[in-house]
C-alpha cells in the first residue's frame, strides 16, 4: 500500500529528547526527511551537529544533509547553562566511544549555513513542514535574510513556549527553555511567519505528566536490545536517572512535536487558537509567551475588528499512547506504526 509522505525539515539542538524525536521521524514510514539543521541550545551548535549525524547512523540511514547554523542567540546573551546536569556534557549520555562511535567529521555540517539552507530547501519544497525542537535562531535569521521565507513552509510546528506562564528554566524564570534560549528569535518567528503555526508548549507535558506517568512505561521501548534501542537508552540515561531520583519518568517532549508534524490529526487531541507575543524585557518573564486572553490587547485602533497579531494553534492535549507505540515500532524494528 502506498503511504502518503509528509516532507519534514527538522531544526534541532541535538540533545537526548531531540535524538529520540529524530529517530522517530527517521523510522516512521510516513515521514520523508529532507534535511536537518543544527542550532545552539542545550549544547553548542557543533555538538548538536555531531549528535544529529551520529543519530542518523544509529538509525542506519545516510545521505540526509545536516546544516550547521547559529552558534549564539540573536543578542548573544548568556543563558541557562545547568542543563548538562540533565543531558550530560555532550547532551546524549557522554559516551562517545559507544555505538555509533563519534567521528571527527560529525562536527562538520554541509557547506552552507543552516538559515540559508532553510530558505533554499523550503523554497523548492513548498509542501514541506518545518519542525523546530530547539531555540528559533536559525528560523529568525532566515526571516531576516529573506522576507518571502515566511510563506515557504506549508506549516511550522514548534516545540517551545508556554501559555499559562509555566516555565522550566532554572533561576526562577517563567519561560520555557527553547524560547528563553532566544526570546528575540521567538518573537520574530511568531510575528512574521505567515504559514500556519502549531505550537506544542511546555504545559502540554506539565499538566498531564502525572496521568501519563501512571499509564505509560517510558523506558520500555529502550529495552529491545536492538542497536537503535541501545543507542537511545544511552542517550537518555542521565536524564532518566535524574527523573527517577525525583520519583518520575523521563517522558516525551520533542517527540510529541515531531509526531504532531507527522500526523497532527492523530496526535493532537485538543488544541486552542491564541493571540500571542513573547516578553522581551521582564527580569523573571523574559522569553515567556504572553497571551491576549481577551483579544483586546493588540487590537488595531485603525481597524477595530482586526488584530495586529496573528492567532497561533497551541496543542493542549495529545495522544501519548500513539507516540509510545510509534517509538516501540521504531526501536524494536517491528515497523508496526499503524
Swiss-Prot record:
Molecular function (Gene Ontology), one example: adenosine nucleosidase activity
InterPro entries named among the record's database cross-references: Inosine/uridine_hydrolase_dom, IUN_hydrolase, Ribo_hydro-like
EC code: 3.2.2.-, 3.2.2.1, 3.2.2.2, 3.2.2.3
Keywords of this entry: Calcium, Hydrolase, Metal-binding
Domain of life: Eukaryota
Pfam families per UniProt: IU_nuc_hydro
First-level EC class: hydrolase
Note describing how the cofactor binds: Binds 1 Ca(2+) ion per monomer.
Cofactor(s) needed for function: Ca(2+)
Binding residues for Ca(2+): 13, 18, 133, 254
Sequence similarity: Belongs to the IUNH family.
Subunit structure and binding partners: Homotetramer.
PANTHER family xref list: SI:CH211-201H21.5, SI:CH211-201H21.5-RELATED
Protein name per UniProt: Nucleoside hydrolase
Amino acid at each position: 500500500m502506498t503511504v502518503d509522505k509528509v516532507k519534514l525539515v527538522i531544526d534541532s539542538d541535538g540533545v537526548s529528547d531531540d535524538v529520540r524525536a529524530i529517530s522517530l521521524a527517521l523510522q516512521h514510514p510516513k515521514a520523508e526527511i529532507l534535511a536537518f539543521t543544527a542550532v545552539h541550545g542545550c549544547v553548542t551548535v557543533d555538538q548538536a551537529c555531531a549528535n544529529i549525524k551520529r543519530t542518523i547512523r544509529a538509525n542506519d540511514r545516510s545521505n540526509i544533509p545536516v546544516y550547521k547554523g547559529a552558534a549564539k542567540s540573536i543578542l548573544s546573551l548568556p543563558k541557562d547553562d545547568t542543563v548538562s546536569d540533565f543531558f550530560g556534557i555532550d547532551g546524549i549520555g557522554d559516551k562517545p566511544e559507544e555505538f555509533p562511535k563519534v567521528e571527527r567529521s560529525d562536527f562538520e555540517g554541509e557547506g552552507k549555513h543552516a538559515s540559508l539552507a532553510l530558505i533554499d530547501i523550503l523554497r523548492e519544497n513548498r509542501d514541506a513542514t518545518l519542525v523546530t525542537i530547539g531555540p528559533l535562531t536559525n528560523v529568525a535569521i532566515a526571516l531576516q535574510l529573506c522576507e518571502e521565507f515566511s510563506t515557504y513552509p506549508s506549516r511550522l510546528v514548534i516545540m517551545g513556549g508556554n501559555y499559562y506562564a509555566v516555565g522550566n528554566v532554572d533561576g526562577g524564570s517563567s519561560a520555557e527553555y527553547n524560547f528563553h534560549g532566544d526570546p528575540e528569535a521567538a518573537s520574530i518567528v511568531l510575528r512574521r511567519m505567515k504559514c500556519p503555526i502549531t505550537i506544542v508548549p511546555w504545559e502540554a507535558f506539565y499538566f498531564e505528566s502525572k496521568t501519563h506517568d501512571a499509564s505509560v512505561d517510558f523506558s520500555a521501548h529502550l529495552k529491545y536490545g536492538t542497536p537503535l534501542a541501545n543507542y537511545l537508552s544511552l542517550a537518555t540515561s542521565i536524564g532518566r536517572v535524574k527523573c527517577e531520583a525525583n520519583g518520575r519518568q523521563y517522558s516525551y517532549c520533542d517527540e510529541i512535536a515531531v509526531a504532531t508534524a507527522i500526523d497532527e490529526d492523530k496526535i493532537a487531541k485538543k488544541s486552542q487558537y491564541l493571540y500571542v507575543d513573547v516578553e522581551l524585557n521582564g527580569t523573571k518573564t523574559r522569553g515567556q509567551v504572553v497571551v491576549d486572553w481577551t483579544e483586546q490587547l493588540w487590537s488595531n485602533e485603525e481597524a477595530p475588528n482586526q488584530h495586529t497579531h496573528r492567532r497561533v494553534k497551541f496543542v493542549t492535549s495529545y495522544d501519548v499512547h500513539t507516540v509510545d507505540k510509534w517509538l516501540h515500532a521504531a526501536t524494536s524494528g517491528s515497523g508496526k506504526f499503524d
